[in-house]
Amino acid sequence: MKIKTKENTKLVARWSIFLLFWMMIATVAQSSEVNQTALQNMIRDSKARAAMVEHVREAVVHIRVEKSLNGAGSNLQNPSNQNNPGARQFKQQGLGSGSIVSKDGYILTNNHVVGDSDRIVVRLHDGQEFEAELIGADPPSDIAVIKIAADELHPIQMGNSDEVKVGETVIAIGNPFGLTQTVTLGIISAKGRSNVGITDYENFIQTDAAINPGNSGGPLINLEGKLIGVNTAIFSKNGGYQGIGFSVPVNMAQIIMQDLIAEGKVSRGWLGVGIQDVTAELAQAFGVKNTKGSLITKVMPSSPAETAGLIKGDIVIRVNQRKVKNSSQLRNYIAEAGAWADVTLEVIREGKTEIIKVTLDELKSASTSTPLKTQSSLVLGILVQDLSPDVVKRLGYDPGTGVVITEVESGSPAAQVGLKAGMVIAE
């Protein structure tokens, strides 16, 4: 009996080893099959992405601009002076990108690419070149529209920038350093970036897709091949790519583009209030639960805000059912609504929520017939000038008090704390 027990034990051990061996083989085979499936999926996705990019590239253009510069000084005289035989003229050249947005030749790009240029030349993906006409440019948003007379154009599809998510894969296409039709891949790093100090109206999509000089005006697209942003600027200490790029959301760019095509300029809404972000201290003082919204610090006399009944201390938390996270967002919403638009504001007043309807006015840029004294602050990184009589009256300030910021240096202390061109420093 003991001998049989030993033989049975050996037999069980042999079968156990045999079964374990085949289980290991089956596991390895299954793992290999899974890896092959994953690899095939990656290859399929890669080919699909390449096909999509190839299609979208037909809508991306290379832009070359020229601007005449008159020489100044003893050796560089004004060329318009016919009595000067040594008159000389210089041409400044620049490069950028753009997206074809219609079959009849409209192209969306940046103001800093084509604004104030004497000549604009557009090169299509197939190498054809066309002289372009500047339809309109909007420096406050850095958006511009040009047009070419060409046939068989392939416009880009418009996406919805409000729907994109942080972490979503995106692709940038453009002409960095003149290298045409360059494609880079990245993700959306952040949405709603403001207080960057690049433009007056900021609501940027931030991406780590490589963007370099020459990419400006080109498209940022999603994996469906739809335009979600206009590549505009980079954050860099050396002028090159450092992983932080900014694009104007297509929803914002489209509103501006439509105004430029229809009127040649942008008509923005004006509420007539001074605003600031709600800090933790202010939230506690006003008895609100969080720092979302925009605090009204001043109501301009005879403004739409005053007419509608807004008062100092109101906290605006929604505009037409859209949540307001900060003052920059409120400013953008009011501007986008346009002149004479009826908007519904949801505000917190003394701890209670109120609904206020406002008919906006048109935001007018400050103008004056005589040059104003300009001052600069190298420490803060701002350029300011005295208030014109028109601005003093419109903003409700006393004559001779305050200055208006005309320029903010990117990355300066002023930019970091949120100062922007157009703001008034009263004290």
Name each region found by the language model.
Residues 1-11:
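N-terminal secretory signal peptides that target proteins for export/translocation
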Residues 16-27:
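Bacterial N-terminal signal peptides
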Residues 23-25, 299, 408:
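Processing junctions and N-termini across compartments
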Residues 406-427:
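C-terminal soluble interaction/assembly domains
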Residues 31-344, 348-390, 400-401, 410:
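Serine-dependent protease modules
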